[in-house]
Amino acid sequence: MENPMVNYSKIIANTASNHYNVRDEYKNNTVEQNVAITMSEQRRFSVGCINITGELNIGMMIRSACLLGAENFYIFGRKKFDKRSTVGAEKYINIVQYNFDDPIHADESINERLEYLLKWNSVVLCEHGGTEIGSHKARLLYKEELENPLFIFGSESHGLPIAVAENPHFYKMSIPQRGVLRSFN
């Protein structure tokens, strides 16, 4: 008998063809039908990440964004991610990648891309020291100022680039950590 953990591409193909990560009521749908359902339930926000080093981490972020109803997922810096951790979510969310030859030293270029996205989005940096999500101030911002928010997360070890973190055109919010775990990783 073949070891099922050896042939990842076979496992991925089998999972996709059987809709294993699709809710039971949608398992008999085509992928196109499920895409249409997902698009009809999306909310007016996007999620992005900058210089995430773990390829599985990017995939898990894509899956989380998709489950929360994001329209888009932006990747700044990495050329690839491990699709195994998306468990099929990459089919149901628009993924935009901005690749840089040297992503670690592309801070100004990333900042310029985010400035460009201000035409369509309110850029919200998720970092320590910002307005706490759930606070009265955050509720007012979300209600009165934020249009199509693009929530940006920094790398696991370095956070957000300084050029991005200090940009006065971007909002800065904090999502307080709960429970006993140290991190998502």
Model features per residue range: what roles?
Residues 1-185:
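Post-transcriptional modification and biogenesis factors for structured RNAs
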